[in-house]
Amino acid sequence: MKTLLGKIQVPDNVFSGIRGRSYSDNARLHLGKSKRNLYKIDLTSFFPSISRETVYRFFFEALCCSPDVAELLTNLTTVDLKKLNQSNLLEVYDFLANKGVKCYNHLISGAPTSQILSYLVNHKMFDELQSLSDKNNVTMTVYVDDVIFSSEHKISSEFRQSVLSLIKKYNYQVSRKKVKGYSKTYPKLVTGVIINSEGKATIKNALRKKIMVEYEYLQNNPADIKSRQRLRGLITAARQIDKSAGHSQILCKVQWVQE
């Protein structure tokens, strides 16, 4: 089903489970020759807040599926907590209640179809956010529950409030702790990528440290195949962020593991 959903055309600034698009591509849209102000928000408990009814309406109305087909597809992509026989179900209820989520029949967290569906079933909300951004000369990207806005100009408090009001209109909540604004010269963290004070993507220090720790371990345990694979994966992740990272001192030290 993910393959079929992936055939639906979505805007170029959407990176929610889209084949060929990654978290680093999402951050890259906020780079540029000039430094940019940035404003980012996180939708609280996004998947559990996407109700079965919302998913059903998408299949029935947007994709014009028959009622029985829409019902089947909804059953495959949502979960009803009340039908699950779990010993810790009360703990789950309490957790969701503390997050302000009142929906117990919702999009499945972790399912391969959920990321793309989280955008598709809410495309009207994201379209409105995009329209608002266009009117204010703001660049917007969507990576699942992370919505990022950037501009060469100041991002006004009026714009920020309009964003929050629009999201509230669609019955979603924003994690206040994860709402952040950055000035042009301040380093920014965007979906795991650091945008430095010069407006360029750089590798997080935590990733550099992981590479060095794994490299040192592999030097002492050269026959450890899993360590070799982990190191290769870390290098690949670093190069997704900064393609020139392969020439840095850190990554040159581990170049041999890719031979």
Where do the PLM segments sit?
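Right-hand nucleic-acid polymerase module
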Residues: 3-71, 75-111, 119-133, 154-259
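Short acidic donor-binding/metal-coordinating loop in glycosyltransferase active sites
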Residues: 43, 144-145
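Short beta-strand
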Residues: 139-143
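Short beta-strand->loop micro-motif that forms the acidic, two-metal-ion catalytic signature
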Residues: 145-151
